[in-house]
Structure formats: structure tokens, C-alpha cells
């Protein structure tokens, strides 16, 4: 069963005050060296290679302006300018004036050309020796949009998942000729209703409650009853832990189809995941992008009642019975999110590999517990026949290795030719982390849980922001450990 997936302009500063002619000899010499470096930057080198032309360097450097404040003392300026030389930042223009803030200080204006990385590193060093007064934004390469123009689009904030959710490849009302409900006009109209509900939903809204028909509830009941018999001996312990909680808090019963809004609120409290309605199949890229935000796209329609134990597509029985119980587990939730994060901005080829790994883990994965094979994949936990088959001697079971698993063919209408087993979710997560390192991407990403947005880690400044958050968390942990030690008398 196929899962439903599958950021200078150089604004001239008001230049007033005295010139740099008052600089000490050492400063004159340093300025001369900097000017010489700039003049020689376009000449041929010793090997006869031509310097880059203006057009060639336009995409590698931009004009930048910085104003910093120094104490009016001998040697202060030379120390600051030496940093420009060390970072190979070419100065185009430099001026000074008495500080408007403090009479004992001098403000230095520098108009220069450099690359983004060099400039960011320069600023970090200048902060230790000077006071940064102002920075002008850079030209050319410094716009984030231009940097990412060759990277496939991905949502940068959770509300942009609306765009992903509405890019449905195949609507739930468009049934194939071999679909059990193809000739049932009443069923087709019902499916259209669920499509309209999903397409009208936007982030932040409560999920519309559905009044399921008697036949839909009956179909749900058959699936619920038959699968419940197998779970004690076939499902992993994490599943068995959360299933009773869903019965208690979300109305998981044979005679009741749970509402997505109740399920979403439950998951939010347990693991930070939420669900949102979707009208049908999404591309692997759009579906995995949701996981990056801990959002699971979930169908609301129910399979045709003529064959309750079969569905050619993921329906709400598959989502609620297969996926939701494990999405309530924090470790499994993190494993799911990391697959999603790895997909953001990745190539089509890499996304397909990630989607295949998703298929054979989160959809059809097995794990070992107490020496026995147990199922954690939603495709298994929502399919009576394949759940029995996967844990039988007839099934081909292999150790999960993303490098080989991503090459396995995904089968939709028949049982899988192979299933992949992990010792634990933690082991599977670590293997996926190693595999994600092979994905070609000019940056890393970080999910900010406070703003529910994706931060692009591409320079020292962006990484510094994340480190600040981690340092705060680490301080909390250290404080807790110290209090424990005091309590225990250690």
C-alpha cells in the first residue's frame, strides 16, 4: 500500500571630519599594502592564469560597507586594518571622523569588496577590538533568494505547508477503474466531499469534524476489530503502549471513527506532531517536507465497504491505526522528522532515496524486541494479511541499511519482496543520519521549534544562533545534574 507521499548595496555614509593623512607611518604602510593587493587582484599571476574579470567575480563577491569605532590612540587603527588584510578583504575607500557618541573615539568608515564568508569572519574578529556602529547590506550574492535559486523550493515556515498540501498529484475522488468504489456514485460523491474539506483547510484552523455514515463506521469497525486481534503478538511495544491511550483520549473504538482534530491535539502533547487533512497523493518531496515540521498529512476518507480488508490507497484506517500510535512515541517522531529534514532542498534523486527508506521503515519496517520480530511500519500495522506474512517464515527479512534499502523496489499492489529490520528506532535513526550526510546540499537545516520555521545553516552567524540555543539547553541540563548531585550528597 502506497503511503500518502510518498537572503551591499553600498549606501555612502555622511563623510565628515579629518582624513587618514594623520595616520601613523605604520598605518600608511599597511594601507599601501592593502591598496597594492587590490590593484593586483586582476593581474596575471606567476603561472600565467588571468585574474577574474568583473563579470566573473560578480557572483563571488559584493560591495560592503562597515563603520566601526576606535579609541583615539596610536596603533588602534593598524590593529583593526590588519584584520582586513588577514581576511583578504579589499578596501575600496576609507575615511574617519570624530565619534558622535564619544569624544574619545574615532569612527572609521570602510567601503570594501569581499565574499560573504570573509566578511562575516571579519565582523566577528572586529567585534573583539572595536565597536561596530553600522553595517550596510551587501550586493549581488548576498541575497538568500539568489543563493537558493538552484535549490528545489521547500517551505521555510510551517504555514507554507498549505502550498505543499494543496499540490495533490491525484485527488481522492479520482478512482481507477479497478478501485472497489469506481462504479459506486454515492461513494464517489462522498470522496469528493473529503477532497473539498482537505483543499479548504489552512494552517492554524481546527480540522473540520466529519460525521461518518453508518456504512463508513461499519467498515472502520471491521478493520479495527480484526487488527486488534493481531497487535498483541505482532506490534512493537511502543505501539502497544500508545494504542490504549488513543482509546482513552481519542475515541478509538470499533463503533467510532476518531476525529483528526482530537488525534492532532493528542499527538501534539505526546511528541509535538500534528496532523492535517490531505485530499490525496502528494509527491514524496511535499510529503516529507511535512515531516520536517512534525506534520503528518492524513486522509479522512474510508475505504469502500465492499472489501473492508483491502484498500489500493491509504485511507483513514491506514493513517489512524497504522501511523498515529507510533507518531505518539517521541523517539519514533524524531526519526520521522529527521527523514523530512534531510529532504529539504535535496535533489530529486536524493529525495527518491529518502522516500524509499521511508517506505521500508515507517511504512513497512520491522524491529527486534525480546528476541522476536515485531512490526512498526504503518503499512503492516494496517494490513491484516501482510502483517501476518511479514512476521512469518515465508517473508524475506534483511538488516536495514539505507545504502542498499534505497535501491529496493517498492511494491504497491502485492506483498513486499523484502522487509528490513532494525534493532531499535535509535539504530535506524543513526543509520539514516549517516546516510543523510551523503546528500548533496550547499547548506544544512535546523528546525526552530519556537518559531516553527526552518533556519538555513550556511555561515558562522547562522550557526552561532543555533549554538546559543543549544548552550541554553545544556545549561539547563547541567543545572539539573548539579541539583541531583547535591541531593544525593555527591
Swiss-Prot record:
Residue stretches of biased makeup (Polar residues): 50-62
PROSITE patterns: ACT, BH4_AAA_HYDROXYL_1, BH4_AAA_HYDROXYL_2
GO annotations of cellular component type: neuron projection
Cofactor(s), names only, from the UniProt record: Fe(2+)
Modified residues (Phosphoserine): 19
UniProt pathway: Aromatic compound metabolism; serotonin biosynthesis; serotonin from L-tryptophan: step 1/2
EC annotation from Swiss-Prot or TrEMBL: 1.14.16.4
Keyword Phosphoprotein annotated: yes
Catalysis: reaction(s): (6R)-L-erythro-5,6,7,8-tetrahydrobiopterin + L-tryptophan + O2 = 5-hydroxy-L-tryptophan + (4aS,6R)-4a-hydroxy-L-erythro-5,6,7,8-tetrahydrobiopterin
The entry's keywords: Iron, Metal-binding, Monooxygenase, Oxidoreductase, Phosphoprotein, Serotonin biosynthesis
Domain ACT: 65-140
GO BP term, pick one: aromatic amino acid metabolic process
Signal peptide, first to last residue: none
Family: Belongs to the biopterin-dependent aromatic amino acid hydroxylase family.
Summary of subunit composition and partner proteins: Interacts with DNAJC12.
Protein name per Swiss-Prot or TrEMBL: Tryptophan 5-hydroxylase 2
UniProt source species: Macaca mulatta
